[in-house]
């Protein structure tokens, strides 16, 4: 009965919605004949970002064991599908709708009414693929042990509420970017994040931290004395290919955030993106080579992604040399951050917490340090953005505040969500299911039907009781 009532209400809302501002684009084109070029640019870049889902899927699959690969792929597929519907119905309105008290948007539900407009829906699509990125980050950290149903609920909540509300604070005219206090302290502008080091990556990374804490480590990850054991992924080639896909897609992520093909700064944005990734990869490779005597493939991949994450916020406002410094520090964060977490009993399968969480925070702070005053809030228009190295200590403090708020919101809401799910339905599969593998346990399928399983972990599962 309740379900039928909800459907009826939804139909009524859609039927009574007023016509969009410009659903066929005629008026928009009349006002600005050059706008189609910008539309094509933004959409193509959005397509690149959407394809990053494949990169995340490949990277996570490569770092996971063969018995869990179908589950990994299914999670990455469905967080985009579920997230698309959630962001369509609720998320976009909360993020980009008419501002209410600097907290959230209040218009644009179901892309109906005035939101049924070519310009608005272009923005919806671009923000959607960012929402999908934020959601899928968590998948890798918690791989090989969560219930698939729990992951679906999580994907819907992140795309509908957690990402949109924080996104509104930065990108929708909310309090972090636009309040009088923040703007005055920053010297004419509040908190900034060009393409999402904080809004997307740190958000996903700190939700992952909360989830990993509540899930517990995989069976066999730690010995009886609490020392970590290596659990190798089944295919490093997948991980490297996934890294290449992410690196390529990131040009759409960062350069596409201009939302305009007429913005010539895209050359610097793209170059900064590449340099930071390269510096992160080389740094992580060097650290593992010196530490272990051989360069680690997985850590090198993570170093590249960490560099990409860190440059995402400052990419439009810093010089190329700064991007190398930012990427180098991100390489240190990715490696030492992973080892630091591992020693504390936090089993992050792909290293997403240091790569996206810690490096995302570093990206927000780096913007407050290295912004050089050559680029403004709106292209070359004043005010031009400067950081600590160029005399604007106030903006540096603004970015520190933004980083603290980002952690508090992401970790707090993520912990609350997974804690509630743990109490209500449970968030982890049984020990027997974990040892069998989530491909069979959750989907009655296997990714490699012709492979012979050589793992004999069921006795260990029974002994350790699921690590909970």
UniProtKB/Swiss-Prot annotation:
Membrane-spanning residues: 1-21, 39-59, 77-97, 123-143, 156-176, 194-214, 236-256, 268-288, 297-317, 321-341, 350-370, 400-420
Subcellular location as annotated: Cell membrane
InterPro entries reported for this sequence: Ammonium/urea_transptr, Ammonium_transpt, Ammonium_transpt_CS, NH4_transpt_AmtB-like_dom, RhesusRHD
Twin-His motif. Important for optimum substrate conductance, annotated site positions: 201, 356
Membrane topology reported for the UniProt record: Multi-pass membrane protein
Keyword DNA damage attached: no
GO CC, any one term: plasma membrane
GO molecular function, one term: ammonium channel activity
UniProt keyword terms in alphabetical order: Ammonia transport, Cell membrane, Membrane, Transmembrane, Transmembrane helix, Transport
GO biological process, one term: ammonium homeostasis
Function: Involved in the uptake of ammonium/ammonia (NH(4)(+)/NH(3)). Transport is electrogenic.
Family: Belongs to the ammonia transporter channel (TC 1.A.11.2) family.
PANTHER family in UniProt: AMMONIUM TRANSPORTER (PTHR11730:SF6)
Subunit structure: Homotrimer.
Name the UniProt record assigns to this protein: Ammonium transporter Amt2
Lineage: Archaea, Methanobacteriati, Methanobacteriota, Archaeoglobi, Archaeoglobales
């Amino acid at each position: 009965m309740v379900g039928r009532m909800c459907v009826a209400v939804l139909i009524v809302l859609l039927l009574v919605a007023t016509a969009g501002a410009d659903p066929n684009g005629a008026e928009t084109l009349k006002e600005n004949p050059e706008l189609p070029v910008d539309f094509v640019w933004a959409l193509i870049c959005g397509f690149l970002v959407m394809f990053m889902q494949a990169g995340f899927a490949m990277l996570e699959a490569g770092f996971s064991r063969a018995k869990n690969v179908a589950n990994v792929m299914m999670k990455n597929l469905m967080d985009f599908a579920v997230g698309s519907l959630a962001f369509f119905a609720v998320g976009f309105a909360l993020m980009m709708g008419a501002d209410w008290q600097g907290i959230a948007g209040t218009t644009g539900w179901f892309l109906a009414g005035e939101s049924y407009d070519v310009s608005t829906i272009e923005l919806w699509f671009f923000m959607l693929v960012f929402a999908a990125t934020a959601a899928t980050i968590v998948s890798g950290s918690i791989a090989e042990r969560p219930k698939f149903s729990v992951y679906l609920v999580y994907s819907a909540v992140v795309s509908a509420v957690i990402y949109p509300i924080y996104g509104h604070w930065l990108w929708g005219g909310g309090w972090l970017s636009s309040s009088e206090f923040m703007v005055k302290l920053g010297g004419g502008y509040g908190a900034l994040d060009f393409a999402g080091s904080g809004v997307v990556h740190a958000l996903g990374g700190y939700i992952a931290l909360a989830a990993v804490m509540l899930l517990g480590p995989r069976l066999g990850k730690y010995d009886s004395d609490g020392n970590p054991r290596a659990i190798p992924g089944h295919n490093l080639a997948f991980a490297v290919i996934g890294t290449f896909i992410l690196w390529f897609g990131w040009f759409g992520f960062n350069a596409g955030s201009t939302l305009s093909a007429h913005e010539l700064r895209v050359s610097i944005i793209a170059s900064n993106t590449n340099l930071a990734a390269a510096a992160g990869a080389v740094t992580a490779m060097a650290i593992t080579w010196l530490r272990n005597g051989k360069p680690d493939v997985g850590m090198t991949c993570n170093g590249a992604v960490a560099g990409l994450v860190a440059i995402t916020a400052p990419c439009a406002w810093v010089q190329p040399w700064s991007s190398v410094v930012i990427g180098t520090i991100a390489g240190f964060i990715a490696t030492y951050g992973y080892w630091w977490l591992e020693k504390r009993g936090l089993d992050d399968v792909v290293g997403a917490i240091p790569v996206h969480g810690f490096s995302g925070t570093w990206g927000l702070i780096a913007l407050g340090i290295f912004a050089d005053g050559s680029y403004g809030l709106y292209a070359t228009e004043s005010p031009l953005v400067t950081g600590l190295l160029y005399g604007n200590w106030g903006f540096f403090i603004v970015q520190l505040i933004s980083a603290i708020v980002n952690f508090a919101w992401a970790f707090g809401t993520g912990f609350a969500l997974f804690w509630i799910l743990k109490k209500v339905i449970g968030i982890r599969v049984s020990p027997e299911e974990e040892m069998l593998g989530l491909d069979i346990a959750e989907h009655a399928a296997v990714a490699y039907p012709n492979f012979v399983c050589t793992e004999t972990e069921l006795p260990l599962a029974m002994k350790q009781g699921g690590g909970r």
